Design a protein with these regions (language model features):
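Glycine-rich beta-strand-centered segment in the early N-terminal region that forms part
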Residues: 19-36, 46-85, 94-99, 116-118
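Short, surface-exposed secondary-structure boundary micro-motifs
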Residues: 33-34, 76, 110, 244, ...
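Mid-domain Rossmann-like dinucleotide-binding core that forms the NAD(H)/NADP(H) cofactor-binding site
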Residues: 68, 122-200
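N-terminal Rossmann-like NAD(P) cofactor-binding module of classical short-chain dehydrogenase/reductase
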Residues: 72, 215-218
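NAD(P)H dinucleotide-binding glycine-rich loop of Rossmann-like/cofactor-binding domains
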Residues: 76-154
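Glycine-rich phosphate-binding loop and adjacent beta-alpha segment
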Residues: 90, 170-172, 178-181, 221-290, ...
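C-terminal capping/lid region of NAD(P)-dependent oxidoreductase domains
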Residues: 150, 211, 286-290, 301-322
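Short amphipathic alpha-helix with an adjacent loop that forms part of the alpha/beta core around
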Residues: 202-212
Length: 322
């Protein structure tokens, strides 16, 4: 089969023929039609995870066929039986085991789910990792409630967009942030109430003046600007962190947290229950993933460059065997 191989970190990905995967007990092989990219794949290419052993086939998201049926795969393996957190055996498709950027991939049989009927395969390939992460952050951890006001940071990325779509479906009042005015306007066209440019000095003061405080924040950046998120929170608000692309949180005033009874919660990926509930939400509200661009398989490096640029609005998808 053909697979996209990372042979060393920070080197061009090459497409080569490798042996078909051989499933072990309780595993099956899925024929991949489309695969979706995530920032995780870029970070693996750059060697930013511990214990990476090259050569490597990355990719956590896919839509394909199994026994002639259209399927997608929950990329969160071995979560365990406790809903509050993952087990010590938890892993994500695409590291350390070979992932979705190949014509075939072996996965646990229990991870296979039917492709939602209203979705095309390329849309299905956009959904699993980002949709699961967004669902858990917004609903399982954030406990989003209809009528609440939510700020979703970094709009344009896959998780942020799914969080926005899910929040809108549930009847929340959605606000977004970005450093790109075009992305803000696109989000507003999709239903967001308004957006702010976090590069603007004292944006948080303007936000509260114009829109009031928020009850919930969904953030994947952290970093030096995190303290401003606290400042726009209403009493008893929740801030859910699902990523840390901007690094350490260094400017945080404890009194602003405990006096307003604010909860700061961590969230990553999700359980099998989260995944099933996410699919139910997507099907009930006929939600379609936002796709930025679909690349042919032989343009895998161009797809990674697009992801690295940060210019995308929505998911980047590869046509493996469309």
């Amino acid at each position: 089969m053909k697979a996209a191989i990372i042979k060393e970190k920070n080197t061009p990905i090459v497409i080569e023929q490798i042996a078909n995967p051989e499933p072990s007990l309780k595993e099956v092989v899925v024929d991949v039609q489309f695969a979706g990219l995530n920032h995780r794949d870029v970070w693996i290419l750059k060697g930013q995870y511990a214990g990476i052993q090259y050569p490597m086939v990355v990719g956590s998201d896919l839509a394909g066929t199994y026994l002639g049926k259209k399927v997608i795969v929950n990329p969160a393996f071995n979560w365990g039986n406790i809903q509050t957190h993952q087990s010590n055996h938890f892993e994500i498709l695409g590291l350390p085991k070979y992932g979705a950027l190949a014509e075939k991939v072996k996965v646990p049989e229990s991870s296979i789910h039917p492709l939602p009927e209203h979705l095309k395969p390329e849309e299905g390939a956009s959904l699993p990792l980002a949709g699961l992460t967004a669902y858990r952050a917004l609903i399982s951890r954030g406990q989003a409630v209809k009528g609440e006001k939510v700020l979703i940071t970094g709009i344009g990325g896959g998780v942020a967009l799914f969080a926005m779509q899910f929040a809108l479906a549930l009847g929340l009042e959605v606000y977004v942030s970005s450093s790109d005015e075009n992305k803000i306007q696109k989000a507003v066209s999709l239903g967001a109430k308004a957006g702010v440019n976090y590069k603007n000095e004292e944006w948080e003061k303007d936000f509260v003046k114009n829109f009031g405080g928020v009850d919930l924040v969904i953030d994947g950046a952290a970093g030096d600007g995190f303290g401003k998120l606290v400042k726009i929170c209403n009493p008893a608000a929740r801030i859910v962190i699902y990523g840390g692309t901007n690094g350490m949180i260094t400017q945080l005033i404890p009194q602003q947290i405990f006096w307003k009874q604010i909860s700061i919660l961590g969230s990553t990926m999700g359980s099998e229950t989260d995944f099933k509930n996410m699919l139910t939400l997507v099907e009930k509200h006929q939600i379609h993933p936002v796709i930025d661009q679909i690349f042919p398989f032989d343009e895998v490096n161009e797809a990674f460059n697009r992801m690295s640029s940060g210019k995308q609005f929505g998911k980047i998808v590869l046509g493996i065997a469309p």
